[in-house]
Amino acid sequence: MGNLVIPLGKGRAGRVESGQRIPPPAPRPSVECTGDDIALQMEKMLFPLKSPSATWLSPSSTPWMMDFILTSVCGLVLLFLLLLYVHSDPPSPPPGRKRSSREPQRERSGRSRSRKISALKACRILLRELEETRDLNYLLESHLRKLAGEGSSHLPLGGDPLGDVCKPVPAKAHQPHGKCMQDPSPASLSPPAPPAPLASTLSPGPMTFSEPFGPHSTLSASGPPEPLLPLKCPATQPHVVFPPSPQPHGPLASSPPPPDSSLAGLQCGSTTCPVPQSSPLHNQVLPPPTRVISGLGCSSDPIWDLYCWREAATTWGLSTYSHGKSQPRHLPDHTSEASFWGDPTPKHMEVGGCTFIHPDVQKLLETLIAKRALMKMWQEKERKRADHPHMTSLGKEWDITTLNPFWNVSTQPQQLPRPQQVSDATTVGNHLQQKRSQLFWDLPSLNSESLATTVWVSRNPSSQNAHSVPLDKASTSLPGEPEVEASSQLSQAPPQPHHMAQPQHFTPAWPQSQPPPLAEIQTQAHLSPPVPSLGCSSPPQIRGCGASYPTSQERTQSVIPTGKEYLEWPLKKRPKWKRVLPSLLKKSQAVLSQPTAHLPQERPASWSPKSAPILPGVVTSPELPEHWWQGRNAIHQEQSCGPPSRLQASGDLLQPDGEFPGRPQSQAEDTQQALLPSQPSDFAGKGRKDVQKTGFRSSGRFSDKGCLGSKLGPDPSRDQGSGRTSVKALDEDKEAEGDLRRSWKYQSVSSTPRDPDKEHLENKLQIHLARKVGEIKEGWIPMPVRRSWLMAKCAVPKSDTHRKPGKLASWRGGKAHVNTSQELSFLHPCTQQILEVHLVRFCVRHSWGTDLQSLEPINVWSGEAQAPPFPQSTFTPWASWVSRVESVPKVPIFLGKRPQNGPGDNRTTSKSVPTVSGPLAAPPPEQEGVQRPPRGSQSADTHGRSEAFPTGHKGRGCSQPPTCSLVGRTWQSRTVLESGKPKPRLEGSMGSEMAGNEAWLESESMSPGDPCSSRALQVLSIGSQWARAEDALQALKVGEKPPTWEVTLGASVRASSGSVQEDLRSTGALGTTGNPSASSVCVAQDPEQLHLKAQVVSEIALIVQVDSEEQLPGRAPGILLQDGATGLCLPGRHMDMLTAADRLPTQAPLSTSQSVSGKNMTASQGPCALLWKGGDSPGQQEPGSPKAKAPQKSQKTLGCADKGEAHRRPRTGEQGHRSKGPRTSEASGRSHPAQAREIGDKQERKYNQLQLEKGQTPPESHFQRKISHHPQGLHPRKGGTRWEDVLQKGKPGADAFQSWGSGPPRQFMDCMADKAWTISRVVGQILVDKLGLQWGRGPSEVNRHKGDFRAQENVPSCCHRGHCHQERSREMRALACSPKATPKGHHCPVKNRGIRDRDSSWAPPPREPVSPAGPHHHRPRMASTSGGPHPQLQELMSAQRCLAS
């Protein structure tokens, strides 16, 4: 055969077999190639395919491959970064829009931020890629070593089955390194060796491994064998298992890994058991630590990595500590336990130093691993905490820097802290393991936390050591530890080997009882002996519960339950807790059966009862039954409240550390109605008190939910001075006295477990209801209602004696008129009054309308006049003096009970001498409204006349000058300009203050607190008014003293309508002397007339406020405009405070006349209850209050007679004076019916005649003087001439009186303000000057005045029916407005009709002098002023007609 050239490859020259190179031969046929040649050629063609793989797998090519991979990855990353940084220019803004200078900056900053963010992302991605590349590199290295024969330590032994091995995979596969996988292949790689730090903890000496460190491998040390704790193989960790250290004293049930959330359910299903202690040694070398770092670094669960290192360190550290220095020793064989490891052949690890690892490198690796694991742990924890913000850590997180070193780098083994023993010393079963794993799995906030519970262990009775038992280590148990039943013999723990920490024996002083852990409650597992654990912070703090305990050696420490119970509570639901209650009771019975030794009594200063980590129901106690009680109590509390970690039992459940009571202090009422025996006296005292207080305080937050309701019964053994610890409900109202302070204030809010919320709510409601009922029974009105804006401003004095306010009777239909504007504190008082008046008027117009006539007077006078029981009348807003139903005797009680009406109203309604220390504020509208009903009930004795006025005043309000200084006392009198009857309410004030019996009557009607009540009551007593008035007057005469309140005008008027009462209250019985005549006139009036008048007054009840301009300096600057219907007084000083609709046409002249006569009438304005300072007539003020009050025993008598005379003359002048004020007369004439006017005229005439017969003309001159003083409203010329004419004819006086009495509604409508002011001033002056002696007149005089008034009414009735009626009424109003006519004329606008109807005597005779010309003059003015009768005047007129009929 010729030489053939076989091509071996591209560009490759073949070799001739002979070795000679032959030029390419000429083409030959292919037949020359034999089959062998083809085969050879084919074989050689395959060689290039093998060479790359060989090159790739060649160890020498590994660096090149690594470089290539890294370079490619880096290139990709850089390219990605470049692409991110490359960006197009932003689009230019629209042409029509200018870009601000800041926009480019913002865009640039935004770009820079985006670049930074993208760069960071790229860096992260790069790091991940690098990690993956490194992992791949490690994988390649291991593979190459296997192929190249390197790493003999990793080659499996000849006959050893590998079984489960850990096969690392790239991180991208989302499978953590070390995931357990079945690999039957004998060429499978062994898992990475255990971390280098573990090697550092081993005793010095060569380290050998019997086989690949896997689930079948065990360690044997060249030195003495070390006891190791069993560990499980979590799925997330490289399958590295540290063999447990067997215990020579017997097997022990395996325990779960520490309760970490990351560990739950992450087990390989293998049960950890001790490893055989004897096995052939196999000299193996640990693999390089780098693989360990990579595996750990790429682990999906760094927390587990950290835990593994910690566990290993703990295991080895404990073993080295127990042995001191490691000595060569073989572990005992435990074939039965070795079977769990799947290796029938025992194997051992020879402990020794890792000489192949440099100490510095090892230390660095350890630091890096620890930092990385800690960082990831914190990151995961923060992430989970953010996911569960409501859950907070119960203890301090484990800090790797504060723990003892995990690994001992030095050649000499260092002694780690001796193992701690668990307080409960119980063995935990698999079920408990599972439960606790689930617990920590459910509590992400507890991840990898070193939750430790402080356990006080004393090796001797005097020494105490605080040890922290990490809860995550509590699960580990020592093999061979005998099980111990939970009993009082906890201190009798079996002796441990010398190399193990002996369980600490409990001192006899310790309470043997201890709350069983929740796990025990759930699983009824046995208590386990102490378990070694890492020593944590030395301070005795239960980080799980946050309760600090004293380290003092003076007090014996107690075994405190570990924190795992409290940690589990957040996840335990009520039903679950209920299910485990039986076990709790059983365990508590078993554990707490032993008696407790005597404990010191003193309580540690650092005791924090709030955070006492004691399970309710498991309180330490010597007696089992009591513990049963406590257990049941705790059960109910747990059912209703929740976990015990936050629940504080009642008093007894929380005991200070040094104060364990032998018996529970008390038991919850809902659980057991009977109280258990109280704590021994040794534990009584301050400490106990504090504990009780703390218990209730802590349980207070549950009381609202009905969670905890406990009532501490009397404990004879405890300090009585400790005070009650029961929950006080609704004790905020300290104003209530007497009956209001009842046992219900101390009723403990208890809730039964059946329905605690409902029970608690019912208790609260019952308490509140009882309180309100008590207030209602006592006549107290709720604070929000009882106080008007005036009362809110003035302090309500509390009477020294426990005076009960009278009951509040509602007026007409049980409705009490309450001023609800008090809440509007931001409003000015004047504005508030205006609003109230408008509201009331609106109600009257739309609701009442003309139905006032249908109203029937109520006979409130239920008893004789009596002296007020208390010298000082404090009119409480809630006082029921308002009620008309109350008898007169009760009125003084009200007066005594009532706080002062006005701010500074220090008036005393005592019969001795009521003194008004300050300006009297207008009574609250509620009082007015309430008083209105008893309009007819005025103090009959002293205020017979005022009664008549109240009827007339009923509808009208009273305006009260802020102050009326009578006898040096500032009175805030209110001029009650009621429907035609501006009758002064002097009677109440003077009578009540002056005389005992008389004083109380007067005080009722006139007293600032309840001036109108007595009058109203008297007025309401229609049938027996005269007799009662006479009796009252007599009584007043007997005990009457000159009241400091001189003139209370309008009080009597409001008595009938309630406005009278209000006026009296506001005026405070001021100037009762001036009022008596008016009051007597009211008394003299017929019941029907009084009733009608009262209705009219209540309807109209308008208080005219004189303009400040018109007011004279002598007059009080602010007259309260009061609506009789509402009883509201407006402090405004201007007429325009009231709307035009509210003001009557006669109000303007009234205001004028009032302003004119106001000076003179300051003290004498009885009809209107208008109390002026009396600056107009100083003499009037000074003698007024004392004179009028002192000489006049009964205000009514004095007022009737004296006012009659005084009013005659003043009215004469008034009429003349009123001639100038036709507006008032016209308004009155139009407003009142002819019949009413005639009646009023007749009454006035009669009264004037009587007065003239008696020769009571001085008032006229006095009034004339007053008129001269008041040029605005009254013209002395006309007033004088008319008075003269009236005096000559005698009719004008009657007419004036009629305008006063018969036209109370009429005059009230026409010239309420003018006449009221004039009358008040004139009456005050008359009372001071001349009527003072006449106050002593008895009811006979009143009757006589009554007859006079009636006669006077009859005279002017004709005129009133016709046009003359209007004229005369106008004249009378003018007279009333005039200083002389004012005594009764000023009230005349308000009271004239009421007075006529009630008592003609009410309108003083001074009006008789009014000449017909005066009325005529007034008529045109009235017509011009009003143009027509006011709607309210029309109603008043209709009322008058009824009265006349």
From Swiss-Prot:
Residues 90-115, 169-262, 411-430, 460-557, 592-619, 637-761, 894-966, 1143-1242, 1254-1280, 1378-1445 are annotated as: Disordered. Residues 101-110, 1202-1217 have a biased composition (Basic and acidic residues). Glycans are attached at residues 408, 819, 906, 1160. Its main location: membrane. Keywords: Differentiation, Glycoprotein, Membrane, Spermatogenesis, Transmembrane, Transmembrane helix. GO terms for cellular component: membrane. InterPro entries: SPATA31 (IPR039509), SPATA31F3-like (IPR027970). May play a role in spermatogenesis. It is a single-pass membrane protein. Residues 241-260 have a biased composition (Pro residues). The chain crosses the membrane at residues 64-84. The gene is SPATA31E1. It comes from Homo sapiens (Human). It is found in: Membrane. Pfam families: DUF4599, FAM75. Belongs to the SPATA31 family. One of its GO terms (biological process) is cell differentiation. This is Spermatogenesis-associated protein 31E1. It comes from the Eukaryota.
